Amino acid sequence: DAENAYFLLCHLGWDKRWGTDAYSGDYPCLDDAAMDYIIAGDYKGIGFDVIGLDPIADENLTRHKKLFQNKDIVNIENLKDLDKCGKGLFSFSCFPLKLENCDGSPIRAVAWFED
């Protein structure tokens, strides 16, 4: 179903560590093949239950730069409860705050499912 989605949301199970020191430690990141798949796709956005696309030690933000130089795409980080969404298609939207002179914002993420 991923090829039919507008947003690709990745449940890695990392949100279970929210509120612990482990959450912002050595979290999982996409490898080059996954990044190439996303860049080649026609997605409007991607989302994850981790703190970022890049490893915490990558101060150059290599994956962020690769993604945004090749795509006009939304990147959503720190999602929670993606395990409740299942593996099929569903409707998803996110609502950011309107902030000036910022490159990011907290959001309200909402998923809903057809009967």
What are these regions (language model features)?
Residues 1-115:
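Active-/binding-site microenvironments in catalytic and ligand-binding cores
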